[in-house]
Amino acid sequence: CLRLVRDLEVDHGEVKYVILPTVTGVEHKYFAGPFAQRFKRSQVFVAPNQWSFPIDLPMSWLGFPAKRTHTLPADPRQTPFYDEFDYATVGPIELSVKPYTEVAFFHRETRSLLAVDTVLSIPVDPPEVVAQDPYPLMFHARNSAQDPLEDNPANRRKGWARIALFTFYFQPETLNVHPLKSILQNAVSSPNRSKKNYFGLYPFQWQQGWRKSFAMLRQDGQLLVAPILQTLIFNRGPEAVLAWVDRITQWDFQQIVPCHFSAPIAATPADFRRAFDFLQQPDPQSWSGFKHNLPKGDLSTLGQIDRQLRGSVPASPEDKSENG
């Protein structure tokens, strides 16, 4: 990553600003401070309402340079880069632990919306960066511990689809976990008991229907608000989120650059707004409070997490099908 940025500096000059536009994205916050340390003359701007878990530490303790780190002001015109970028902030949305805040940026020259985790598009094929090391794809493409690890296009797609289901649902309805005794017995008979292959341990038991589940999640590559955001975060502040969407759709962007999955995505403000339609479909029968264009069974684990966050008793497995 640093090498690629250094290559860009040759053509465009040194890095002037490092921006952390989220408060909850650990995969972003963890690297932002050390990244900023590598660019000694850059100014660092972070989203408001920053916090760390389990102990709320000062930003400087997380690697952010104390004298160069600033909070993004409410008015984008107060920033030194306003002539190039506008931005809009959502939050704080109160969660059970700490508040959620995210900032979306608009780059005027390229008419690009820079969206951290807000929306994304799921490809059929694994992204190039994932395919650089296909081992995890082969690992998850198997149906049992006895299956060989085979690298071919079909298995890469199969493994990618299952990893995507893991990522967004944690445990989709079509995934069961073997009992511990079966996991150990199957590991003994595995043809590959190497450390890299987790000593033959393979707890997953995929049921028929996982391909349909992936297709319904992917929605032909349309813009998608991740299920976790739909059901655990944005549903807790729908009015604030929709006001944020209104602000963003005033920008005349023609592509979206998210931090995950496919990028850039050809998309218009209307496409972006459509991804948030679920917030305009309240459903008192749904544990999230809204209708979602996703299988209810796949959302059941997120429903259990929601109950835990709210301090109530998790649903039993028998109740899963009723929690959509």
State each model region's role.
Residues 1-7, 103-107, 112-117:
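Conserved beta-strand hairpin/beta-sheet module of binuclear metal-dependent hydrolase folds
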Residues 7-17, 23, 30-38, 123, ...:
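Cap/insert and terminal regions of metallo-dependent hydrolase folds
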Residues 19, 44-47, 113-118, 255-259:
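A structural signal for short, well-ordered beta-strand segments and their strand-loop junctions
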Residues 56-58, 98-103, 114-119, 123-129:
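A short secondary-structure junction signal
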